[in-house]
Structures are given as C-alpha cells and as structure tokens.
Amino acid sequence: MKLAASLNRLSPKRLFRTKSKASVSRSEPSSFSSNASSSSSDGSYGNLKQGPTATPISVLPQNSGDFYTELVQAFKLIDRDDDGVVSRGDLAALISRLSHEPPSQEEVSLMLREVDGGDGGCISLEDLASRVAGTSGEGSVETEELREVFEIFDVDRNGKISAEELHRVFGVIGDERCTLEECMRMIATVDGNGDGFVCFDDFCRMMVPAMNDHHH
C-alpha cells in the first residue's frame, strides 16, 4: 500500500461528503442529523502534541489550510500514543485494525521507508507533509491504489461498501460519535443506483475529485 497516499484518505467523512448538489431520490429517516461533517473538524494544528521529534506546525503551507488540517487529523489517528511521531508499533496497530491479517515486519518497514526516506523507523508530521506535497502532482490516481483504499472499507470483500462497514471504520479510527444513520446518509450521497451500497465504480467517481481538490 502507498502509505502517504492512503493516510489522508482514511477519514470516512472526507471520502463520503457529497460533491454534487443533486438531491437523493430515496427518502431518508427524519432522524438524520447534519452534524456528521462538523464532528470531523475538531482536530487542529494546535492540538498536535509536540513530542521530542515532532514537527513545528510552521512547516505546513499556510495557503492550504483545509487540506493540511485534514492531514494533521489523519496523522493524529495513527499516532495513538500522541508523542508526535508515527512509530513502527503505531503503524502496525492501525493496519491490524483495518485489515484481515496483521502486517509483516517487512511490510511495515517498507511503509515507513516510503514516507521517512531513511532508517529512522518513525514518521514525523513533516515527513508526511513533505511526501504528500511531493506526490500531489503525479497525475491521475491509479486504479490499483483506489482499489487498496476501497478494500479498507469493504470488510467482507463482496465488492461494495455498506453503511455498517463504514460505521465500523469510524470506530476503528477512533471516531465513535458517528451513528449508523449518519453512515447511511453518507452512503446515499454517492450511491449511484440507489441500492444502499457504494460499489467500486461509485467509489472511483467519488474519490478522484476528492483527492484532486487540494491541487487547485
């Protein structure tokens, strides 16, 4: 998995926010609330603990606030012990929660080197920001890469993402406030055929503009 490309896409609220003003044709329960997007914005630069090798927030470009706020939030999801760096243990724990099998030591090492660029054995926010900035102009997203992100959500590997699977990912990454009904609403915003699921084609149509937003 291309770690730098995937970290910033793990937030379900980022992925499943609608890009269209078209209304959803099927009716939705009146109990749906609009606070799904607001609860994803409680992270901020100032809340990132400055550990011994943590990154000064000043390294982040000031003209890309929304994107880098989301990058900081993605970093904090993985830095579970809040020491300002993503260690081998942090990364292995995240992958174990999101996948069916725990990663091998070799896989974790490859992911760390991909972002860190050396043998430090950990990833700072600066490493991640530099890596994402360096890959932002590499062109269109590869289908293989999209498939890897899709499979994080498609837990039962049936080729589509359900509201229950989306809700599970929220719990895994530490956002337990999002309800199943809110997940159903998010699914509805991108569900092309109205079957209550997001297939891979729906996912691709949603992801490409979402991942290119910060380029403009």
UniProtKB/Swiss-Prot annotation:
Top-rank taxon, per record: Eukaryota
Residues that hold Ca(2+) 2 according to the record: D154, D156, N158, K160, E165
Record's compositionally biased regions (Low complexity): 23-44
Classification via Pfam families: EF-hand_7
Annotated Ca(2+) 1 binding sites: D79, D81, D83, D90
InterPro entries reported for this sequence: EF-hand-dom_pair, EF_Hand_1_Ca_BS, EF_hand_dom, EF_hand_pair_protein_CML-like
SUPFAM superfamilies per the UniProt record, alphabetical: EF-hand (SSF47473)
UniProt GO molecular function: calcium ion binding
Matches recorded under Gene3D superfamilies: EF-hand (1.10.238.10)
Keyword Metal-binding: yes
Induction pattern: During darkness conditions.
Protein keywords: Calcium, Metal-binding, Repeat
Record has Acetylation as a keyword: no
Domain EF-hand intervals: 66-101, 103-138, 141-176, 178-213
Residues annotated to bind Ca(2+) 3: D191, N193, D195, D202
Region (Disordered): 18-58
GO cellular component: cytosol
Function: Potential calcium sensor.
Cross-referenced PANTHER family: EF-HAND CALCIUM-BINDING DOMAIN CONTAINING PROTEIN (PTHR10891)
Record's protein name: Probable calcium-binding protein CML35
Source organism per UniProt: Arabidopsis thaliana (Mouse-ear cress)
Lineage of source species: Eukaryota, Viridiplantae, Streptophyta, Embryophyta, Tracheophyta
